[in-house]
């Protein structure tokens, strides 16, 4: 004999399998309806196609029990299905199955968009569809949000809290006081220039050129306009003055040569004398060689003849 508890468990598993089949069938029907609407099938043809077909799938025979008794389960309506679920399933699974069985795709999408609109107020329809919201906010507020996120990440890693002001200085976020000081030093800058820290100075080109020409005129006086523009100054000199300067330079040069020659002559003579004396001292005396005269040769021959006689 089969125990009642085991039989109840088997029946419970069978009913759960049946519910799963019903859920898959309802999902398939919704998919067919969505495909027909996307293909442009009229509503009358969709209604005609659904006539004559059962609302539930064909009855599926359950597995045979050990007592060789075949049981089938049939739910004529959704009310009976809900009653069965309420009786045999826990509350949590009951709610989850009901929400899955009766959920609508359009309702789910609308709920997601409502949640998105709650998180990002003031967003447009395109922003809702793309899930991207362009925030229009104060840069200081945005910087505070970013610093807060950085602090949260650091605290999650290290487990310690850090001062927001220190994080601002470490990240290089400009303070409002710094921007005010910048505006004081560089007046007339725009908001974008304050944010970027770059100030484009507006200077009149005529004023700038005039100041440069004044500086050039100070360095080289009596300069014409063309000479100021080209940077070349043609000096105007009197020819008589130039010739006089050349004559003076030649006269001074000749005087220098004449004054240098008498003083240099004794020094040159002294050096030559010392050189001659050194050569005389270092010179070696030559040996004198006498050449025999003719008479001496004749006397030698006579003596030789006398020697031969003896």
Swiss-Prot record:
Compositionally biased residues, Basic and acidic residues: 270-282
Annotated stretches, region: Disordered: 39-58, 108-136, 156-184, 250-297
Coiled-coil region: none
Composition bias, Low complexity: 259-268
Sequence ranges of Basic residues compositional bias: 283-297
Family annotation (InterPro entries): FAM153 (IPR023249)
Family named by the database record: Belongs to the FAM153 family.
Name this protein carries in UniProt: Protein FAM153A
């Amino acid at each position: 004999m089969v125990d009642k508890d085991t039989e109840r468990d088997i029946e419970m598993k069978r009913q759960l399998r049946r519910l799963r089949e019903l859920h898959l069938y309802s999902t398939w029907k919704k998919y067919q309806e969505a495909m027909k609407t996307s293909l442009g099938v009229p509503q009358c043809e969709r209604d005609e196609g659904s006539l004559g077909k059962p609302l539930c799938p064909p009855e599926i025979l359950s597995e045979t029990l050990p007592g060789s008794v075949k049981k089938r389960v049939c739910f004529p309506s959704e009310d009976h299905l809900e009653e069965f679920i309420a009786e045999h399933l826990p509350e949590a699974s009951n709610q989850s199955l009901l929400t899955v069985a009766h959920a609508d795709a359009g309702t789910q999408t609308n709920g997601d968009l409502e949640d998105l609109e709650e998180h990002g107020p003031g967003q447009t329809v395109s922003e809702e569809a793309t899930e991207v919201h362009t925030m229009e906010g104060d840069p200081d507020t945005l910087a505070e949000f970013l610093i807060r996120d950085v602090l949260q990440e650091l605290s999650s890693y290290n487990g310690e809290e850090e001062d927001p002001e220190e994080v601002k200085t470490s990240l290089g976020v400009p303070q409002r006081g710094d921007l005010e000081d910048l505006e004081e030093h560089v007046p007339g800058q725009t908001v974008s220039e304050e944010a970027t820290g770059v100030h484009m100075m507006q200077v009149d080109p005529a004023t700038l050129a005039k100041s440069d020409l004044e500086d050039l005129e100070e360095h080289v006086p009596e300069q014409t306009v063309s000479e100021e523009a080209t940077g070349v100054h043609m000096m105007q000199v009197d020819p008589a003055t130039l010739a006089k300067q050349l004559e003076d330079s030649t006269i001074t040069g000749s005087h220098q040569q004449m004054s240098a020659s008498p003083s240099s002559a004794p020094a040159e003579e002294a050096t030559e004398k010392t050189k001659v004396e050194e050569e005389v001292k270092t010179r070696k005396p030559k040996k004198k060689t006498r050449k025999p005269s003719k008479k001496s040769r004749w006397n030698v021959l006579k003596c030789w003849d006398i020697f031969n006689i003896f």
